[in-house]
Amino acid sequence: MNVHKMKILSLLMVSFISWQARAESVCPEWSEERMSGEMHLLEKQLDQWNIAYHQQGISPIADDIYDQLQDKLHRWRLCLGLPDKTDNRPIPGNGKMLHPVAHTGLKKLKDEAALISWMTGRKNLWVQPKIDGVAVTLVYQAGKLTQVLSRGNGLKGQNWADKAPFISAIPQYIASAPPLLTLQGEVFLQMEGHQQAQSGGANARASVAGALMRKSVSPLLAKLGIFIWAWPDGPKSMVEKSRLLQEMGFPLTAHYSEPVISSSDVALWRDRWFKMPLPFVTDGVVIRQENVPAGRYWQATPGNWSVAWKYPPPQQITEIKDIHFTVGRTGKITAILQVIPVKIDDKWIRRVNIGSIARWKQWDIVPGDQVTISLAGQGIPRLDKVIWRVSQRQEIVPPDADKFHQLTCFRRLPFECEPQFLSRLAWLSGTNGLDMQSVGNGLWRELIHHGFINGLLDWLSLSVEQIAAVPGIGQGRAEKIYQQFQRARQQPFSQWLQALGFPQGIPLDTSWHSLRQRSIAEWRLMPGIGQVRAKQINHFLHHPEVQMMADFLSQQGIAGFSPEE
């Protein structure tokens, strides 16, 4: 190949790489002029933070957030085809079997101050890694493993003893065991040099749970280990307990239990285990005292003899792509942030619920802003902070809150009613309503968009053929949906009332007619019902749209709605 052809090939490769980098960088849909201006402002802000950090010893933002913003600036420069001049640093990385002894759970400490408070006055304390796995009870009788119980609700769990022979880390027989031996511990996925600081959760717990709950034998069972963290009614001394556990085939307790005197000791091990290679995934540390009550006193609530100090929840920085507003069944409007997808622990985040319109206005967020998000309880995405705001503030017009309340949008039209109407249908078919199986938002949306449903009860008049006419449903599924619609007819009057939107938590009569006869004063005589609540009930019962639905249900023969009842 001659030199001229090689130059052409090189230019083509460079062009392709540049194009690919720009495509992967998720470039904002801005004009070049705006991109240049926003980039200049972000660069200026980063310089200010950098000066504060190096010259004043101040950290206005966390190091990892700073690094992520530097990376954002780097990608924006690629979008404009500019050479990179940023100094990127790598980012540091429900069962039926009774438990012999209840699983107590752990109280989670918020910070080191809470740890100091808990440690005050206690002695003989030990710290262990808080392993991210599945809690179990092992029961040995005459040395033979008889039960492997899931934690369940702490009192009862499932027996996974059939999986135990395939988990080599769990001894099937212990010659030196006492006549009855009960151990509690964590079944985990064995890892090779796992560093929590770099790799996070690695979806380990879900993998373990899946392998244990499968009816068939999973190959993953052979890769599971166990860490014993409690021996109810066992030796008082942790040293003796660890020695005996090691002799019985459970060596990890001895290897990963360290005596501590102060919170700084705990913090040292917490940091060390967070960064060093370990054979398991962790999400913090557990601090235990040697002196614990007898097993018969343990309850399915956190005991006061052990606590957890988890690692800080990981944060990610992302960009606001758009802002949507949803209207709930009762007319409540919620602001939803659509963000550039980011992965936190094992979960991809694309949307963040930030609450009411008023809350959204307090945040002062528009598309293009850079925010940090983390996972709150139960893995729910949470907006933590607005890190950087774009200079050009796009005007966002939310829905008019005055147009929506508890008695609006029982029908699809007008157009702005569709979100609340869809929420009403989802409630009606859900567990709080008529409890229809496999009938949810997706189905309702399709039926609405194909013109089969315009009112809250139109589905009662649909035939199998009409349902099957919706693209993607088909005859078989249509018949199952139709069966659910027909089964709903047999639901009791109280369920129908809740499905329609009648206020919850109120004792109900057995007929629509008798409910409508009550005055506001009579409703107020009932326990827990004040003036406001009584008026809400009265307005619902006498609303024209609601009465029309009651009349229709009477015609359909639904129990409780006939005037004679």
UniProtKB/Swiss-Prot annotation:
List the Gene Ontology MF annotations in alphabetical order.
DNA ligase (NAD+) activity
Q: Which InterPro entries match?
A: DNA_ligase_B (IPR020923), DNAligase_adenylation (IPR013839), DNAligase_N (IPR013840), NA-bd_OB-fold (IPR012340), NAD_dep_DNA_ligaseB (IPR050326), NAD_DNA_ligase_OB (IPR004150), RuvA_2-like (IPR010994)
Q: Name one process (GO BP) from the record.
A: DNA repair
- What reaction gets catalysed by this protein? NAD(+) + (deoxyribonucleotide)n-3'-hydroxyl + 5'-phospho-(deoxyribonucleotide)m = (deoxyribonucleotide)n+m + AMP + beta-nicotinamide D-nucleotide
Q: EC annotation?
A: 6.5.1.2
Top-level taxon in the UniProt lineage: Bacteria
Q: Which residues form the active site?
A: 130 (n6-amp-lysine intermediate)
Known Pfam families for this protein? DNA_ligase_aden, DNA_ligase_OB
Key words of the record = DNA damage, DNA repair, DNA replication, Ligase, NAD
Free-text function comment from the UniProt entry: Catalyzes the formation of phosphodiester linkages between 5'-phosphoryl and 3'-hydroxyl groups in double-stranded DNA using NAD as a coenzyme and as the energy source for the reaction.
UniProt-listed PANTHER family: DNA LIGASE, DNA LIGASE B
The molecule here is called DNA ligase B
Q: Which organism is it from?
A: Yersinia enterocolitica serotype O:8 / biotype 1B (strain NCTC 13174 / 8081)
Q: Which gene encodes it?
A: ligB
